[in-house]
Design a protein with these regions (language model features):
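Extended alpha-helical targeting/anchoring segments
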Residues: 8-9, 13-180
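Positively charged, low-complexity/disordered segments
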Residues: 1-7
Length: 180
């Protein structure tokens, strides 16, 4: 299953055209990624643009599923699906180049995957977002928003702040508990 997530509560409330177009692009990216490792005709969207509530944010969620070809394994699926288009943009190779050029710091684990492979050839992966990394006693939290030609900078900034809220609160709470 590949999930396409985009937009915060502020943007989704009206399900504005920009958010729908951005989400559709991400669903198409997921379909394309899975079509490289799935049996022909099996890639389908099983859930489309449904609102789901997370701890501090609402997201539009779509599920894209397909049946794996016999000649591929879990590692092939991982290579096809990641880095996820939800964090890179499109076209993916050029978007990744631009991110390397434009972002002031390396992403580190942010935007990567966390998960496992088992001995039966299965895997379960999640995109590492809404998280904090602790390095040399300092917590690092990263967040972002999808930027497209018709993005509203103020709305994208607000979305980024909203997305960073949960991990920042977790870091602050952990710090308070450590001093208690």
């Amino acid at each position: 299953i590949s999930l396409g997530l985009v937009g915060s509560e502020m943007c989704i409330r009206d399900r504005d055209e920009k958010e729908r177009a951005e989400h559709l692009m991400l669903v198409d990216l997921s379909r394309n990624d899975l079509s490289r490792v799935c049996r022909p005709g099996t890639v389908e969207v099983t859930q489309f643009m449904e609102l789901e509530a997370f701890s501090h944010i609402l997201h539009l969620v779509s599920h894209v599923e397909g049946r794996m070809r016999d000649d591929v394994d879990a590692l092939d699926v991982l290579r096809a699906a990641f880095p996820a288009g939800t964090l890179s943009g499109a076209p993916k190779p050029r978007a990744l180049q631009l991110l390397d050029e434009w972002e002031p710091t390396e992403r580190g684990p942010y935007g990567g995957v966390v998960g496992y492979f088992d001995l039966a050839g299965n895997m379960d992966m999640a995109i590492n977002i809404r998280s904090a990394t602790l390095h040399r006693g300092q917590a690092h939290v990263q967040a972002g928003a999808g930027i497209v030609a018709d993005s509203d900078p103020d709305a994208e900034t607000a979305e980024t702040v909203t997305k960073a809220t949960a991990p920042l609160r977790s870091v602050l709470t952990a710090g308070e508990l450590g001093q208690a």
